């Protein structure tokens, strides 16, 4: 078991990549604190965690709320004694160019994606410094590297996450804290399906996205979770400041 006895916090654990990662981490021996604003989704994830013979806790709230982040980390450490892994998987997208995106939507995308990475890292790092080790895994996107159409807020936010990941890796490497980003391709999750549904005719958009990958298919959340497990575990003990593309060859094609 690659995470036996470890304590992990995963934001965005109510669905998609966050859920798949929580279940895999639990199956590999970690206790997983689940964070999401969707209580029903979290309950389903916790049931899946327990079905995998693991255990976890539920924490309902807004990942862009710094007080919530601080309280959740403090509660987890108080009950479990340490914090080994933080994975910031919560994400949000609104679509639109810089001209058509509403300012409120832009702020919401940055609050969830960038704020949800910064605030949870800010809460977790002091505990990891006290321990002398820890792994932080952030969620970027292949679009932050390649660019993309009609998704300016999301792409800009994911680019900020890559820069934040690198600077945290430099700032805290000497403390034994590793910080890495995963840049997924188009992964078959509820958020991806919602993004297609915004179009008047979703099917051509869906097919174009699928075919953009060298592998000519969408990724599965479980495939991204395997990459996250690698970054969480000692198998990546000399890996920090990297952006790991799990993109079916999107960037190469």
Regions found by a protein language model. Name each.
Residues 87, 173, 178, 239-241:
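Short, small/polar-rich loop/turn modules that mediate ligand/substrate recognition or access, typified
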Residues 2, 80, 118-121, 129, ...:
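C-terminal substrate-recognition "lid" of short-chain dehydrogenase/reductases
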Residues 121, 157, 165:
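Active-site helix of classical SDR
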Residues 141:
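Residue(s) in the substrate-gating loop at a strand-loop-helix junction
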Residues 126, 170-171, 237:
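Alpha-helical segment proximal to the catalytic Tyr-Lys
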Residues 7, 14-16:
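Conserved glycine-rich cofactor-binding loop
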Residues 97-98, 102-110, 209:
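Substrate-binding pocket helix/loop in short-chain dehydrogenase/reductase
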């Amino acid at each position: 078991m690659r995470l036996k006895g470890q304590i992990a916090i995963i934001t965005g654990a109510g669905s998609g990549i966050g859920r798949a990662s929580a279940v895999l981490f639990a199956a590999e021996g970690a206790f997983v604190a689940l964070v999401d604003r969707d209580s029903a989704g979290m309950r389903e994830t916790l049931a899946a965690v327990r079905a995998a013979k693991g255990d976890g806790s539920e924490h309902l709230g807004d990942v862009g709320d710094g007080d919530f982040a601080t309280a959740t980390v403090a509660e987890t450490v108080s009950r479990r004694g340490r914090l080994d892994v933080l994975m910031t998987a919560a994400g949000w997208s609104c679509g639109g160019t810089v001209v058509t995106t509403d300012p409120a939507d832009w702020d919401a995308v940055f609050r969830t994606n960038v704020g949800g990475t910064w605030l949870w890292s800010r809460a977790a790092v002091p505990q990891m410094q006290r321990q002398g080790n820890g792994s932080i895994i952030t969620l970027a996107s292949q679009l932050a590297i390649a660019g993309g159409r009609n998704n300016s807020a999301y792409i800009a936010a994911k680019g900020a996450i890559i820069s934040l990941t690198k600077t945290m890796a430099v700032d805290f490497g000497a403390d034994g804290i590793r910080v890495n980003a995963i840049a997924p391709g188009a992964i078959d999750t509820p958020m991806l399906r919602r993004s297609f549904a915004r179009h008047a005719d979703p099917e051509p958009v869906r097919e174009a996205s699928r075919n953009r990958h060298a592998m000519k298919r969408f990724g599965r959340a479980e495939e991204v979770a395997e990459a996250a497990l690698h970054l969480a575990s000692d198998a990546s003990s000399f890996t920090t400041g990297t952006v790991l593309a799990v993109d079916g060859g999107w960037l190469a094609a």
